[in-house]
Amino acid sequence: ADGPLAQVAGVVVCCFSDHPLVPMLRHVAPALPVVHILEAAVLHALALGNRVGILTTGAAMVPDLDAGVRRILGGASPRYAGCIATGLGVVELQTGDRAKVDATVRHAAAQGARQGMDVIVLGCAGMTGMEGLVQQGVREAGRTTRVPVVDGSKAGVHLVGGIAACHYWG
């Protein structure tokens, strides 16, 4: 890669979607690991459990996320437990009424646990730091075992860093 891409070990596109920037970057920099946080989160989650589910923001995101997961998995899979929309906006996650946001995230996590999710993915970069709320929701659903909670931003940084450290391209 030339220009700014020549100075980086990899790229994480921090938008929780099947983002079109990823294939573009892979085309111009084929020796550079490039992921979006949806892909990174799903890949991490698959290593942690058998029924991966996503908690996201608005209901309008669900069809796109479902399609993105199918693309990552190569089709429909019983390992994908689906996506639950919280109805919260991206900005609202961080600046909205804290009690409402917390209760909504806990409720969605409880619903996911009842639906059999054994790994829960935070389906928005704005959900970073909400792992504890998700764990509370899982407990409120009566689950006695902990459920891994995957933050796609963290997963992306670690995935790209790990790939870069392996020097697969020599």
Where are these regions (language model features)?
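C-terminal functional extensions of proteins
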Residues: D151-G170
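Short glycine-/acidic-enriched loop or helix-start segments at secondary-structure transitions
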Residues: L21-P23, D64, E131-L133, G161
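N-terminal glycine-rich "phosphate-gripper" loop used for MgATP/nucleotide binding
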Residues: A6-V22, V121-G129
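Short, charged, surface-exposed secondary-structure boundary motifs
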Residues: V42-L48, D64-L65, E92-L93, L159-I163
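Active-site rim beta-loop-alpha module in soluble metabolic enzymes
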Residues: T56-E131
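Short, acidic/small-residue loops that bind anionic groups at enzyme active sites
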Residues: M24-L48, G137-V157
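Metallocofactor- and cofactor-centric catalytic cores in central/energy metabolism, strongly enriched
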Residues: A1-D2, A6-Q7, G116
